[in-house]
Design a protein with these regions (language model features):
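Metal-dependent active-site segment of extracytoplasmic phospho-/sulfohydrolases and closely related
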Residues: 296, 481-520, 563, 567
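Flexible glycine/proline-enriched surface loops and loop-helix/loop-strand junctions
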Residues: 356, 414, 471, 544-550
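Active-site-proximal alpha/beta segments of enzymes that process anionic O-linked groups
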Residues: 198, 230-463, 558-559, 564-585
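A long, amphipathic alpha-helix that forms part
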Residues: 427-431, 464-502, 553, 557
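Acidic helix/loop microenvironments that form the catalytic cleft of cell-wall polysaccharide enzymes
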Residues: 447-451, 506-514, 587-589
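Histidine-centered active-site microenvironments of extracellular/periplasmic hydrolases
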Residues: 77-81, 315-316, 498-499, 504-543, ...
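Membrane-interface soluble catalytic domains
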Residues: 4-52, 57-74, 78, 94-101, ...
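Transmembrane and membrane-interface helices of multi-pass
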Residues: 1-252
Length: 614
């Protein structure tokens, strides 16, 4: 008896190990740019999934159900584990630097377990075969298989997975548009075959679910199965509580929910934006440049001033052009030495930096005016060029702001060659700008965003080894590459667009020596650069603004006040600008003691050693 039990235990241990290694292998081989700590995190995440699946098999065998009758549930689970991850990898392996899908794998494992637990549970309750249960489970299995099937059909047609953009198009379509799309792209025969195929699959699964109730259940009283009944109930409730969150994180649902969030935010933003824009009163300066001119704002990504040689970083010359420009021409290149981000991630930081909303007024984003609005009202033609991902639903507020520009363009949209894009690919966009107009240009770079190894061309490697992953040297190389990009932007704009002012700041900082954290963000991740170039003509035309900015180079500042600073640099007076928040104004009210960061949870004054790299 003991020998038999040991054999059974070995069988389940092998099954557990097989499922666990399968999930880890799928994640590992279909991921790109995944740091080791994320892999370790998923080792922990998939452990309970494998335990649940093993318990499902154990209880199925314990009650002598035929093993072949569990195959429909296995097929459903495996479809979720494999489909999205493999298709996403095939679609983006040559163009993406970060593929990190893990929810589909966990969802597949949990769905398999839950289906098995539920079937055993219901047979423990009714103790007899049931056509209704066969039908219900066959229908549920078919519904669950629809998601991987739709992804397979979509991939076979478009050679990519369902993106947020595709989901937005779907949610915006009315029934007639959807009908026309299906008829045009699939045709009546295709629609008929798909419906017929799904119907046949459902009938097949219903038949496969049909089984006889084993004697262990049909002839046993409730008391004998009481313990198993309670264990199954706990397992079913536990998985059911977590499963909706897991489902929301799967590839197809992440795209759909992201699209819904975007459309909801867009609806709110559009509802108030026109009204707010109409009410915006702007009084531009009476002093005019001698000919049409350009102001440029470059938004950096994850650029920490502690790692910039322009701010004293000595390990390597990571920003040689900025450093030399400031050293040789400090009257035109102004370096602000005590600037912080309002938060350690892009969306929360920039939705404040680019609008009236800040840490101190906590204004609703959807009711806030933007830097684009200010520039438009002041008579500038507005441009937004971005190397950020347009598929990134986390950047929804930023995309909403960007799309209000006269010209908004994401270079990802024009990536016909399916290659990795670098910030240097933004440079041709400047040639689209008309030099005979007053222009306000925003360039949103990828900067030093994870994974930094892919933020610069291999031939640009200066401090590391070509193609070798190293957090610190890759981060330094990404900083050096963007320093070169800034130089090219500056040179082209000064020679061709009558550049009068150029502002560079970052959404937040980073620390390549430490993994990124979402909570209790350390100060090093909040310390950012702010560098402003002013032309000779600008300084002669606006001497007061120039002198105030020079005086404020050692003033403390947070980037959620960039909206007012841009308004000040554009020489705008408005009913939607507060001079007390404007670093270019003598009225600027904030000091080291009053400024906050981390969305108001931290005081800047508590950063006792700004130069320390923790």
């Amino acid at each position: 008896m003991k020998k038999y039990a040991l054999k059974i235990n070995k069988k389940y241990f092998i099954f557990f190990l097989s499922i666990y290694l399968l999930m880890l292998s799928v994640f590992f081989f279909t991921s790109i740019g995944t740091e080791s700590y994320r892999f370790l995190l998923n080792m922990r995440r998939y452990f309970p999934v494998a335990v649940a699946a093993t318990l499902a098999l154990f209880y199925w065998n314990y009650y002598d159900f035929p093993v072949k009758k569990i195959l429909p549930d296995c097929f459903v689970g495996l479809s979720w584990i494999f489909t999205h991850n493999i298709l996403d990898y095939l679609a983006y392996r040559n163009v993406s630097t970060n593929i990190n899908n893990f929810f589909d794998i966990a969802f597949g494992g949990y769905v398999f377990s839950l289906l098995v637990f539920l079937r055993i549970f219901w047979y423990l309750v009714i103790k007899r075969p049931s056509k209704l249960i066969d039908f219900i489970f066959g229908f549920i299995q078919t519904a669950l298989l629809l998601f991987p099937l739709i992804e397979l059909v979509y991939f076979s047609y478009y050679h990519t997975t369902i993106s947020t953009a595709a989901s937005i198009a779907f949610l915006q379509s009315n029934p007639n548009e959807m009908k026309e799309y299906l008829l045009q792209n699939i045709g009546v025969l295709g629609i008929f075959c798909f419906i017929a195929g799904i119907s046949m699959l459902c009938i097949f699964l219903i038949k496969k679910n049909k089984l006889e109730v084993p004697a262990k259940i049909s002839s046993a009283g409730f008391r004998k199965n009481k313990r198993t009944f309670l264990v199954l109930l706990v397992l079913i409730i536990s998985i059911s509580v977590y499963l909706p969150k897991c489902f929301a994180g799967t590839g197809i649902m992440h795209s759909m929910l992201g699209a819904k969030q975007y459309l909801d935010n867009a609806k709110k933003f559009e509802k108030y934006h026109k009204e707010n824009f109409d009410q915006l009163q702007v009084i531009p300066s009476t002093n005019k440049f001698s000919k049409p001119s350009t102001v440029i704002l470059v938004i950096g990504e994850s650029a920490g001033r502690n790692f910039m040689s322009a701010y004293g970083y000595s390990a390597n010359d990571t920003t040689p052009w900025l450093r030399k420009s400031i050293e040789k021409d400090s009257t035109h290149f102004l370096r602000f030495n005590h600037v912080y981000s309002s938060y350690g991630s892009t969306m929360q930081s920039l939705e404040r930096a680019l609008t009236e909303k800040n840490q101190y007024n906590n204004k609703d984003f959807s009711r806030s005016l933007t830097i684009i609005d200010l520039a438009k009202k002041a008579g500038y033609k507005t441009y937004w060029f971005s190397n950020q991902s347009v598929k990134n639903t986390a950047d929804t507020p930023i995309q909403l702001i960007a799309r209000t520009a006269d010209v908004a363009y994401w270079i990802e949209d024009g990536n016909e060659n399916n290659r990795i894009l670098y910030d240097g690919d933004l440079l041709p966009c400047l040639k689209k700008v008309n030099a005979n107009e007053n222009n306000f240009i925003v360039l949103h770079v990828m900067g030093s965003h994870e994974l930094t190894l892919h933020r610069f061309p291999p031939e640009f490697t200066r401090f590391g080894t070509v193609g070798v992953f190293d957090l610190v040297s890759n981060y330094e190389d990404s900083m050096a590459y963007d320093d070169w990009v800034l130089q090219q932007i500056f040179s082209y704009a000064r020679e061709n667009l009558n550049l009068q002012a150029m502002v560079f700041f970052s959404d937040h900082g980073a620390n390549p020596y430490r993994k990124r954290v979402a909570d209790n963000i350390p100060f090093i991740n909040l310390r950012i650069p702010l560098i402003i170039y002013l032309s000779d003509e600008y300084e002669q035309l606006y001497p007061q603004t120039t002198s105030v900015l020079i005086e404020h180079e050692n003033q403390y500042f947070t980037n959620d006040l960039m909206y007012e600073l841009i308004g000040g640099i554009l020489q705008i007076k408005s009913n939607h600008l507060d001079e007390k928040n404007d670093l270019s104004s003598k009225e600027f009210q904030f000091t080291r003691d009053t400024l906050k960061t981390d969305l108001g949870r931290k005081n800047i004054k508590d950063d006792y050693n700004e130069n320390k790299i923790e």
